[in-house]
Amino acid sequence: MTPERDLLVVREKFGVGGREPTLKLPGGALLAGEHLGQAVEREVLEETGVKAVFESIACFRQWHGYRYGKSDIYFVGKLRPLSKEITMQTAEIQECLWMPVDDFIGSDAISNFNKQIVRAALESDGIVQSFIEGFGGPESREYFMPKHLIDGSGVVPFPTDFSQS
């Protein structure tokens, strides 16, 4: 979301379950071995062309029996866009735009799920990417905690200068 409270939203080309596609947040699946923050930045860039910096997890949901009898966990990340220039991915996306957040939340065309996850991002600082010293390396683990717990006494900011295999 921008400082002016504009929200980056997409409309996919294909609806789920035979429904018409509606405006929603960009997103997708993590690649094997990919950290969550990197995945959120990558998915937004792939779908919209907008480069953004991951800041925190606003909320997440778990869905039992999603596919193949497995549960699905969906994370909503807060990002800070570095530009507002859109280059839409045309293979999967039919529309991409910056929308005033109040219009998004007030729209009858937006699902209640999407409205509530955006409210969570607006009304909370979320949990931030961190690292607990002594429990593996940052190349294979990451932790998400309230920012005030990252105090240097065993919980530190997640390093940005490591090589991920």
List PLM regions with ranges.
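Nudix hydrolase/Nudix homology domain
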Residues: 16-22, 32, 90-165
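N-terminal strand-loop-strand
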Residues: 1-25, 52, 56-59
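The catalytic Nudix box helix
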Residues: 25-57, 77
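Generic structural "secondary-structure junction" signal
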Residues: 9, 25-27, 32, 62, ...
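Active-site-adjacent beta-strand/loop module that shapes the phosphate/pyrophosphate-binding cleft
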Residues: 2-5, 62-86, 101, 117-125
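Acidic/polar loop patches that form or flank catalytic/metal-binding clefts of enzymes
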Residues: 55, 86-88
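Extracytoplasmic/secreted proteins and extracellular or luminal domains
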Residues: 50, 69-70, 89-92
